[in-house]
């Protein structure tokens, strides 16, 4: 199936009804037309402000409305963030993502956020932030600081969304994506499988993403991590093949986007992750923690990469870091390297 400018629900439903073997074959063919199938982009995600979020997202342990035992933390100091970015770079990541548990950032925090972006860029890393909804001015300021990507997930279909979140509308999410795009920042947006949604809802989510004026450059697909104390703690487990199918359809519908295995990898065995890569996933979060939930340790990822013959993708040289491409693969294999730029001294 050729890439379409706009998809219809019937076309997406047809993909969900397709035999999995045929679907994987189609997804892998499309993937190879646009990407090296042996290259996986590696990102690290840091929670720069944790907990006490006023939103009521039913899956999230950071909501102030749920008793999950999560300790709240104020916005991190800029140098603390940059030290984490150095460690991520030394471990082989090429993109550093910073997440804050806010409904939206306060203007008084913007100078610190801008410094974080500039510092991460000075390290030779791609930068990404997820801070909630943005104003036009805030998006422009982040773009001016050099932010590469902004993450703002749609989470699920418009029809099912109200069952999961009531404190932020679907349109607010779409509006933020528009502001990010208009500011010249690349868009990162995806969703979660396992919220209690139907197959039609999964199709609706992918339809929304693929039919944006410009599809997201990065599409994170999360498997629900059930956290005690949240309303979704007792949800049914996601069938591995259903998750793999969602990855494959995301690849088919958004052939030039990075499809990222995000939250939930700790729950997946190696075989499931391998099939996700075969289905067209070509990005992962690397490190022991995603915001506040577990993620496979680096050594496990390295072992799986070796078994599958996968290599970390080498990114374009950024901000004068002329050695990053040559060092990247070795850095991934040698996580304790001491080599890094001191952004604070720049």
From Swiss-Prot:
NCBIfam families: bioB (TIGR00433). The gene is bioB. The lineage of its organism: Bacteria, Pseudomonadati, Pseudomonadota, Gammaproteobacteria, Enterobacterales. One of its GO terms (molecular function) is 2 iron, 2 sulfur cluster binding. Keywords: 2Fe-2S, 4Fe-4S, Biotin biosynthesis, Iron, Iron-sulfur, Metal-binding, S-adenosyl-L-methionine, Transferase. This is Biotin synthase. PANTHER family: BIOTIN SYNTHASE (PTHR22976), BIOTIN SYNTHASE, MITOCHONDRIAL (PTHR22976:SF2). Belongs to the radical SAM superfamily. Biotin synthase family. It comes from the Bacteria.
């Amino acid at each position: 199936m050729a890439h379409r400018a706009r998809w219809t629900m019937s076309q997406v439903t047809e993909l969900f009804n397709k035999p999995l073997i045929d679907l994987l074959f189609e997804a892998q063919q499309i993937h190879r037309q646009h990407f090296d199938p042996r290259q996986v982009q590696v990102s690290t995600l840091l929670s720069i402000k944790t907990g006490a979020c006023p939103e009521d997202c039913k899956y999230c342990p950071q909501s102030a409305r749920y008793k999950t035992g999560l300790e709240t933390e104020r916005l991190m100091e800029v140098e603390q963030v940059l030290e984490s970015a150095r460690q991520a770079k030394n471990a082989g990541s090429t993109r550093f993502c910073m997440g804050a548990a806010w409904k939206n950032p306060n203007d008084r925090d913007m100078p610190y956020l801008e410094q974080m972006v500039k510092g991460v860029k000075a390290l030779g890393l791609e930068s990404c932030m997820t801070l909630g909804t943005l104003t036009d001015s805030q998006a422009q300021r982040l773009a001016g600081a050099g932010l590469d990507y902004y993450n703002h997930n749609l989470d699920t279909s418009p029809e099912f969304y109200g069952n999961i979140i009531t404190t932020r509308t679907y349109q607010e999410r779409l509006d933020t994506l528009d502001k990010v795009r208009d500011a010249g920042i690349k868009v990162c947006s995806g969703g979660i499988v396992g919220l209690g949604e139907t197959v039609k809802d999964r199709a609706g989510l992918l339809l929304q993403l693929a039919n944006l004026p410009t599809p997201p450059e990065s599409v994170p697909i999360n498997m629900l991590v059930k956290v005690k104390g949240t309303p979704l703690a007792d949800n049914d487990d996601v069938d591995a093949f259903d998750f793999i199918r969602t990855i494959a359809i995301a690849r088919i519908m958004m052939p030039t986007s990075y499809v990222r295995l995000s939250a939930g990898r700790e729950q997946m065995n190696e075989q499931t992750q391998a099939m996700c890569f075969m289905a067209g996933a070509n990005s992962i979060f690397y490190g022991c923690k995603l915001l506040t939930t577990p993620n496979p340790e680096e050594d496990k990822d390295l072992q799986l990469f070796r078994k599958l013959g996968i290599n970390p993708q080498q990114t374009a040289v950024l901000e004068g870091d002329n050695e990053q491409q040559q060092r990247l693969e070795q850095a991934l294999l040698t996580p304790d390297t001491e080599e890094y730029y001191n952004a604070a001294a720049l």
